[in-house]
């Protein structure tokens, strides 16, 4: 029997979705990036045939996301800002090869300290972010934790006291234009006293309040010549009349609405369950619904109708940010050290123009890997294994070659040898779901059911839509009866 801790990890990242969600992503040519600070994950939501693939990456309390059309991505975490860059040339090399159309690699990690970072956005002069703990909008530079650029007139000083719970940010023409806050208070945590109806939507350039009396507003957005806001305490999506401040509800949803992005007539909205705690007690949503949902809901903004949803189960209970990746359908995001970070180089265009690559042959180790792939696809497993071994003798840190050698050895029923190589793969790349699944296959054939179950469950945790691993786990459980 597995321990209770191990069995508890079997289902934490499961999700269900409407059948039209994958087709909708395919038709729009998009994927989604979702942050869940409560679960400590960034989720890539990708269509995979007729299924939806939710691909999880681990970061410490990820919240704000900022993505632009040049391939830059920034993620705010508990005390850092991670900056990534899409490196398209790496994407075809990521396992399974030929499936990915984008690969985001880290370029910079900036230490902010614990500032409770909320929404972020790229602007004309770099990255802007909401510093909720110090109640201000900030930019960054290399010498400072953060550079305060704006605070509301009702906040009298910079202090790590979360005086008004500034949270949402929208840019217009490359500069901050709209923000949301949960109160207009100037004392430590003062917004909590009237959280149900103390929220405001503000104009940044004028520092004027556009709309007041809102219930925990988040995520202001300017889209389609209209100002949108999520009135989270109501669980609603609404438009705002900029001249009068009137709120016009468009849709009410079964959760705490926070995080939104648009594509065409569709809004992709994050929903959170919200805990029964002092923070969320007494808001309209908890009075309207005894049970709330966590996931991504898709709303037609013209009709207000819900057209699709992705619902997270078990451990994922709160969503912060939702971003659409336009023109990218199957992205990868690396946050851990791996061979791609060691061997991928991004250069300025001026330098790239002087890089000579046309006559550079494959290295001997790369040629061995290439020969191994050819032999494998031709069904010559022993020959493929020889090529992979030769390449690993030259370059022992080729994890792709070691993984392929491991699965060949499992196919050849050389269980112990396969386990030896696959364990090295997961030691280097702990998120390699396919390697964990192959380890499970090897262990089940060695009658080591405990280890087999652990690796199948680990593969499913890493990729909840990994049907092969689920089927293998079902077989194992049947054998254990």
Specify the residue positions occupied by each region the protein language model found.
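Sequence-structural signature of mature extracellular/luminal beta-sheet repeat domains
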Residues: 2-366, 370, 379, 413, ...
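Helix-start (N-cap) detector for alpha-helical repeat units in TPR-like alpha-solenoids
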Residues: 365, 399-400, 415, 433-434, ...
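Structural signature of tandem alpha-helical TPR/SEL1-like repeats
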Residues: 371, 377-390, 411-424, 431, ...
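Short, charge-rich amphipathic alpha-helical segments embedded
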Residues: 390-408
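Alpha-helical protein-protein interaction scaffolds
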Residues: 434, 438-441
């Amino acid at each position: 029997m597995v321990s209770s801790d191990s069995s508890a990890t079997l289902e934490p990242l499961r999700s269900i979705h409407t059948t039209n969600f994958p087709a909708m992503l395919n038709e729009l040519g998009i994927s989604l990036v979702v942050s869940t600070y409560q679960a400590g994950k960034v989720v890539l939501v990708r269509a995979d045939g007729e299924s939806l693939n939710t691909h999880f990456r681990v970061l410490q309390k990820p919240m704000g996301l900022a993505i632009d059309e040049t391939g830059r991505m920034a993620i705010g975490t508990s005390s850092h800002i991670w900056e990534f860059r899409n490196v398209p040339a790496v994407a075809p090399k990521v396992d399974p090869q030929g499936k990915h159309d984008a690969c985001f690699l880290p370029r910079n990690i900036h230490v902010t300290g614990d500032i409770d970072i909320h929404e972020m956005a790229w602007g004309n002069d770099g990255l802007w972010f909401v510093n909720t703990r110090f109640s201000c909008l900030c930019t960054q530079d290399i010498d400072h934790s953060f550079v305060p650029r704006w605070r509301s007139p009702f906040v009298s000083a910079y202090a790590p006291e979360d005086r008004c719970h500034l949270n949402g940010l929208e840019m217009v023409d490359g500069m901050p234009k709209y923000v949301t806050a949960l109160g207009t208070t100037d004392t430590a945590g003062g917004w909590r006293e009237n959280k149900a109806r103390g929220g405001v939507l503000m104009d940044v350039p004028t520092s004027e309040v556009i709309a007041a009396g809102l219930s925990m507003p988040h995520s202001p957005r300017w889209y389609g010549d209209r100002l949108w806001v999520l009135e989270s305490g109501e669980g609603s999506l609404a438009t705002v009349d900029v001249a009068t401040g009137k709120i016009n509800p468009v849709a009410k949803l079964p959760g705490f609405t926070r995080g939104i992005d648009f594509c065409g007539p569709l809004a992709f909205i994050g929903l959170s369950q919200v805990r029964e705690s002092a923070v969320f007690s007494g808001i309209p949503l908890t009075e309207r619904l005894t049970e709330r949902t966590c996931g991504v809901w898709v709303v037609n903004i013209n009709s207000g109708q819900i057209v699709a949803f992705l619902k997270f189960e078990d451990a994922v209970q709160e969503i912060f940010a939702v971003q659409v990746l336009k023109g990218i359908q199957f992205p990868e995001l690396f946050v851990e050290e791996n061979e791609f970070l060691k061997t991928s180089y991004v250069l300025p265009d001026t330098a790239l123009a002087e890089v000579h690559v046309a006559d550079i042959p494959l290295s001997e180790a790369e040629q061995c890997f290439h020969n191994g792939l050819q032999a494998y696809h031709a069904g010559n497993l022993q020959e493929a294994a020889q090529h992979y071994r030769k390449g690993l003798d030259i370059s022992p840190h080729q994890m792709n070659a070691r993984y392929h050698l491991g699965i060949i050895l499992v196919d050849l029923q050389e269980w112990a040898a396969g386990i030896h190589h696959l364990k090295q793969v997961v030691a280097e790349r702990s998120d390699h779901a396919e390697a964990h699944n192959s380890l499970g296959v090897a262990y089940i054939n060695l009658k080591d059911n405990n280890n087999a179950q652990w690796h199948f469950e680990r593969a499913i945790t890493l990729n909840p839509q990994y049907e092969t691993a689920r089927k293998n786990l079902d077989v194992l459980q049947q054998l254990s009866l």
